[in-house]
Curated annotation (Swiss-Prot):
This is UTP--glucose-1-phosphate uridylyltransferase 3, chloroplastic. Involved in the biosynthesis of sulfolipids in the chloroplast. Catalyzes the first committed step in sulfolipid biosynthesis. Converts glucose 1-phosphate to UDP-glucose, the precursor of the polar head of sulfolipid. In addition to glucose 1-phosphate, can use galactose 1-phosphate, but with much lower activity. No uridyltransferase activity with other hexose monophosphates. Specific for UTP and cannot use ATP, CTP, and GTP. Induction: Induced by phosphate starvation. It catalyses: alpha-D-glucose 1-phosphate + UTP + H(+) = UDP-alpha-D-glucose + diphosphate. Signal peptide: none annotated. One of its GO terms (biological process) is UDP-alpha-D-glucose metabolic process. It comes from Arabidopsis thaliana (Mouse-ear cress). The lineage of its organism: Eukaryota, Viridiplantae, Streptophyta, Embryophyta, Tracheophyta.
Length: 883
């Protein structure tokens, strides 16, 4: 009978390498049995294939043909593994792991894995030419060990040539091409048994097929992939430990359906009793004075803080594609409000550093650690962006990029690795929870210490509002002030949203002691904890808890202790979410979509390692006694994410770039109305599904970033519906300005100017030669944005304008307008070292351009002086005296 698992592809003999087939015996109950998705066609059923076979015989007339089998190829319907299959496989792999764990060197480990039943069977059934193949490839002992680990883990199909695994796809259209492809499989299955002696084939290759240079490259890349898994997941047993964890989680998932959930949860968390409570929070909306004080602690502690960005996610839901190349792009490259999301993060950080300079007169450059991945060339895109923007005027030494490994995607049915082609498993990033171990492995913690840092703020790239007003500064300030280990920024949760919740965990351990701490439960685990994701009106339990936003403060030393753990603790809350479809193209370009997932862990669940122990059960308030805490603010000041593409014909704008823009506009409305500026209110999202927003307002964060600071730069006026206000400037004064149309102010030196460091890199010097703009009693009237244009993309800040009033300030240029109406289209471009004044004249505008005097070149003719007054910041506009 033809082997159902050996279907090599036929290649030309030149410049190819012979490889092997795998003839694993399968049975309907075999845990790792692999099947064709559909029956293969046979030679006997196709005259065209018979004729082609005769041609092949004529071309090979110098070669002896042993025999050709026309027996139908075996085909079996995939059978989902039963519980016993999982348990027996888990037991086998755990036994193997324990033996490997006590083996002190590679030689001993190799001896252990050679004794594994799967490995023995594999090499005994594929002994022909294997050693020669591996020798030709130049595999060293470690690479051979990795290959054996894959086999021992039951994933030898990742090494096989040209067969398909059955994952039970629900719907698949069988094309003529697919049928022909299957027929070719059968043809080649027979041809492989020929005794070939022509040029390029030496000797009898009864079990051989060939690899071309591309496939050899895939194999080499596959070895690198395996080595990264083996090294990074060493804390759980490498490749084999990864598969054990996958199978255990799948088994738990099936067991959960038939077992008391609370018992399962308590068993998995290793405790006798577990209860979740609604956590107490530090509500920044109710305690404004305390919020101001906490934010000041955050500013004051900026020299002790680092910044961490986990950017490694695949962001598949965003569907971002380069319009020119067609390449899939990572979320960090999404152009939102005129700049990439990564640029937005750095701009927010620089705004806080600018505020620190204005208060204390000192430069402060925060070191930034960025976790990337190979998904969608994430690492290359992020690196290139940083280089192109000259490291944002911060110097390359203040950035540390570290790349997370990719992990194999697995079938939801049986935990088998999903393979798109030989040596190419479908792979995804292993979740942002790998960041702590990876940071330790890559020396990121020591790098932060070398920069004198004690703590760090963590935010995700898709959240565009996390730095609004006091949220981020208060979070960090409280963590530093009270030596906390971990803090969460939280808010009200939107029912049904794909976001987790923060909870207060109460556990009774088997030793009789009690533990308490703030934790997070991801939405994918609501079912595990028996939490309903219904709307509040349906009394869903999730409505009682605040949202987890993945905005964190972390004590670096505490995080390092967890990341350096030599066990599973370094990978917090490992989960296997198999409720999504894995989509991929095979080597023939055929599309596949299967239910699956990958082993991932959650960054925020490092909190589970920071619980506080008590000898007895606690009652009443615990906040002061815990190492974990929550600050709480209005949702649109905490989280609004651009993480998924707006669905067609859908009214759901939540977590889309469109919805994120609306929240930015709502924040702008809240801020400016507090400054006595009249403007229309932003309505609910569903109002703007098919309509543009009522206006476009984008403000540079360095105008604050604290709203207490921003409010002192704006006073009175109005912004009409269908108007636009964009301010790319920090030194700005607005007094009774009316905008009916478009007003754009852009300062080249919004926060300062750059000077070269010792390496010749441009470094931003805050407060040096800033561009400045004053608008007092000014009316701006023009036709503004063409709101009827079909090509406008408002969230991208890509709009067509009919008219605008645009002020461009080069270098330290200044612009002043007072008691004037600026009507129609105008572009005022002020050169470096000059001031442009506009007032009313007899025949319209009176325009006066004059050079700045030498004594005010650095400071400007005026500036905002920031002074601390208790827990508040007071601004005073200072005119610089000139001789």
């Amino acid at each position: 009978m033809a082997n159902p698992q050996a279907s090599p592809i036929l290649h030309h003999p030149q410049n190819h390498l012979s490889l092997f087939h795998f003839r694993t015996t399968t049975s309907p109950r075999s845990f790792s049995s692999l099947h064709f998705r559909k029956p293969l066609l046979f030679l006997s059923s196709s005259s065209s294939f018979s004729s082609k076979l005769q041609q092949s015989e004529q071309q090979c007339n110098n070669h002896q043909v042993r025999h050709v089998s026309t027996v139908p190829v075996e085909y079996s319907t995939p059978t989902p593994p039963e519980s016993d299959d999982f348990l027996s496989e888990i037991d086998r792999l755990k036994s193997l792991l324990s033996k490997l764990d006590v083996s002190k060197d590679l030689r001993r480990k190799d001896a252990v894995i050679d004794a594994d039943s799967r490995v023995r069977r594999f090499f005994s059934e594929n002994r022909g030419g294997l050693s020669k193949v591996f020798g030709y490839l130049g595999l060293n002992s470690n690479e051979m060990f990795l290959v054996k680990c894959v086999i021992a883990a039951g994933q030898e199909h990742a090494l096989c040539m040209n067969y398909e695994e059955a994952f039970g796809e629900e719907e698949e259209e069988y094309t003529v091409r697919s049928s022909v492809k299957n027929a070719l499989y059968a043809l080649v299955e027979m041809i492989e048994r020929f005794d070939v002696n022509s040029s390029g084939y030496k000797g009898r290759r009864e079990m051989g097929t060939v690899l071309d240079s591309e496939e050899i490259a895939h194999f080499r890349k596959f070895l690198t992939f395996l080595e990264e898994i083996e090294q990074f997941y060493d804390c759980i047993g490498g490749i084999i430990g990864y598969q054990v964890m996958v199978l255990e989680l799948l088994h738990q998932s099936s067991k959960r359906r038939n077992t008391n959930r609370s018992q399962l949860v308590e068993e998995s968390l290793g405790c006798q009793y577990l209860e979740m409570h609604t956590p107490s929070v530090l509500d920044l909306t109710q305690e404004e004075d305390y919020a101001s004080q906490a934010a000041l602690w955050g500013i004051e502690g900026l020299p002790d803080l680092g910044e961490i960005y986990p950017l490694g996610g695949a962001a598949d839901r965003l569907g971002l594609i380069d319009s020119e190349t067609g390449e899939c792009l990572p979320a960090a490259m999404l152009a939102h409000c005129g700049r990439t999301l990564l640029e937005g993060l750095i701009r927010d950080l620089q705004a806080r550093e600018f505020l620190y300079f204005k208060l204390y007169g000192k430069q402060c450059v925060t070191p930034v650690a960025i976790m990337t991945s190979a998904a969608k060339n994430n690492h290359e895109h992020v690196s290139s962006l940083c280089e192109r923007l000259k490291w944002f005027g911060r110097g390359q030494s203040n950035f540390r990029l570290f790349e997370q490994p990719l992990v194999p995607a697995v079938s939801a049915e049986d935990g088998q690795w999903i393979v798109s082609k030989p040596f190419v498993p479908v792979s995804k990033p292993g979740g942002h929870g790998v960041i702590w171990k990876l940071a330790y492995d890559k020396g990121v913690f020591n790098w932060f210490y070398d920069h004198g840092r004690k703590g760090a703020t963590v935010r995700q790239v898709s959240n565009v509002v996390a730095a609004t007003d006091v949220t981020l500064l208060a979070l960090a300030g409280i963590g530093l002030r009270y030596n906390k280990k971990l803090g969460f920024a939280s808010c009200k949760r939107n029912a049904g949203a794909t976001e987790g919740i923060n909870v207060l965990m109460e556990k009774k351990n088997f030793d009789g002691k009690w533990e308490y701490g703030i934790s997070c439960i991801e939405y994918t685990e609501f079912d595990k904890f028996d939490i309903s994701n219904r709307s509040p009106s349906s009394n869903g339990l999730q409505a009682d808890f605040p949202a987890n936003t993945n905005i964190l403060y972390v004590d670096l030393h505490s995080a390092e202790l967890i990341g350096s753990s030599s066990n599973a603790k370094s990978l917090p809350n490992m989960v296997l979410n198999t409720k999504k479809r894995i989509e991929y193209l095979d080597q023939y370009g055929d599309y596949h979509s299967v239910m699956g997932g990958r082993l991932e862990c959650t960054m925020q669940n490092i909190a589970d390692n920071f619980f506080n122990k008590f000898p007895s059960r606690c009652h009443g308030s615990l906040e002061d006694k815990l190492d974990t805490y929550i600050v709480y603010n209005e949702r649109r000041k905490v989280t609004s994410s651009a993480k998924k593409k707006k669905p067609h014909a859908s009214a759901a704008l939540h977590q889309t770039p469109d919805g994120a823009l609306l929240d930015i506009l709502r924040n702008g409305y809240d801020l400016l109305t507090e400054c006595d500026i009249k403007l229309p209110m932003i309505e609910a999202n569903d109002k703007y599904v098919d309509s543009p927003p009522p206006y476009l307002i984008l403000l540079h964060p360095a105008l604050g970033p604290l709203w207490e600071v921003s409010r002192q730069k704006f006073k009175g006026g109005s912004i009409s519906s269908c108007s636009e206000l964009q301010l790319e400037i920090a030194e700005f004064s607005w007094n009774n300005v009316q905008v009916d149309g478009s007003l754009i102010v852009t300062a080249e030196n919004a926060m300062g100017s750059t000077t070269p460091n010792d390496n010749g890199e441009p470094i931003l010097q805050y407060g040096l030669r800033c561009g400045k703009c004053k608008l007092h009693n000014v009316n701006v009237v023009n036709r503004g944005i063409d709101w009827n244009s079909k090509s406008n993309v408002y969230w991208r800040n890509d709009v067509n304008r009919l008219e605008t009033c645009k002020i461009i300030l080069h270098g330290n240029a200044e612009f002043e307008a007072s008691n004037v109406t600026i009507e129609g289209h105008h572009v005022f471009e002020v050169p470096d070292g000059h001031k442009l004044k506009i007032t009313s004249g007899n025949a319209g505008l009176s325009i006066n351009l004059e050079a700045l005097k030498e004594e005010v070149m650095e400071t400007g003719s005026w500036y905002w002086n920031y002074q601390l007054n208790g827990s508040h910041i007071h601004l005073q506009q200072v005119e610089v005296s000139q001789s």
